[in-house]
Amino acid sequence: MFKTEPFIEESIEEIRKQINNRKTIIALSGGVDSAVAAVLTDRAVGDKLLAVYVDTGLMRKNESEEIWKIFKEQMGLNLKIVEAKDIFLKELEGVIDPEEKRKIIGRLFIEVFEKVAEEQGEEVLVQGTIAPDWIESEGQIKTHHNIALPGGMVLDVVEPLRELYKDEVRLLAVALGLPDQIAHRQPFPGPGLAVRILGEITDEKLAICKEANFIVSEEIEKTELKNELWQYFAAVLDTKATGVKGDIRDYNWVVALRFVSSLDAMTAHTPEIPFDLIKKISKRITSEIPNVTRVVLDVTDKPPATIEFE
């Protein structure tokens, strides 16, 4: 059985040894993995840590504001927000292949961190990599942004959570005193909404994806399902379908809903969701997002599917 206190003590000591009194940055995403890694590193090296959050433009609605409030104002971390939306979206123009998207995002993430590190004199990059990240990458299922590091990297990498699974990381978060909204926050992919937009990422599809995910989260979090589901989200498919709005024929985008239960993300199943809730979410999406004509439900388990669409 996983014991949090011995792990915390050993991890802090190991982080301190690996960093060896050098200035350090951490890739802070706002999720539980990077949050736990940040707190452990802060306890190990204190003011030598700079938490860096990159706004790629691919994050959830109001994400940057929430990150600042939680990690800077509430938790007191030394936090720097890097506005990089234009860089990421420009590089992703015309890219359709999901693996290519992930590799581009991974490369840009590290380039941004390296630039900040050079400006601040940093030498070490801490990441919130957990076991499913590198297990999936080595099995060539998906390449996660915090594994596909480009050649010639100038920063040493420290991954204090590399051998842990999500349920263990959540236990650590509670033991470390992290806010409940972080400790029990649903996982969010490193590449952000890029993997929930099938095909090319356009401003139109990105806006749809942000709003649809906001609606899904808002409705689920009104119910007890928020404590039962591993993930709940919406994806924008790379196809359009015919619909009717008013008395006028409409040909527009299709949004897919995804709800899964899991313990460690290695396997997942689709639980039964109250149909009236699904209908409510569907109605909100099609009425509040003008360029969506249809909402579908994905009920595929993992395996054979992965949790995210790309």
UniProtKB/Swiss-Prot annotation:
Gene Ontology CC: cytosol
Signal peptide: none
EC nos: 6.3.5.2
Record key words, sorted: ATP-binding, GMP biosynthesis, Ligase, Nucleotide-binding, Purine biosynthesis
CDD domains linked: GMP_synthase_C
EC supergroup of this enzyme: ligase
Gene3D superfamilies, per database record: 3.30.300.10, HUPs
Pathway: Purine metabolism; GMP biosynthesis; GMP from XMP (L-Gln route): step 1/1
Any Pfam family: GMP_synt_C
Catalytic activity of the protein: XMP + L-glutamine + ATP + H2O = GMP + L-glutamate + AMP + diphosphate + 2 H(+)
InterPro entries recorded: GMP_synth_C (IPR001674), GMP_synthase_B (IPR026598), GMPS_ATP_PPase_dom (IPR025777), NAD/GMP_synthase (IPR022310), Rossmann-like_a/b/a_fold (IPR014729)
Binding residues annotated for ATP, in chain numbering: S29, G30, G31, V32, D33, S34, A35
Binding partners and assembly: Heterodimer composed of a glutamine amidotransferase subunit (A) and a GMP-binding subunit (B).
Task of the protein: Catalyzes the synthesis of GMP from XMP.
PANTHER family: GMP SYNTHASE [GLUTAMINE-HYDROLYZING] (PTHR11922:SF2), GMP SYNTHASE-RELATED (PTHR11922)
Protein name (record): GMP synthase [glutamine-hydrolyzing] subunit B
Source organism per UniProt: Methanococcus maripaludis (strain DSM 14266 / JCM 13030 / NBRC 101832 / S2 / LL)
This protein's encoding gene: guaAB
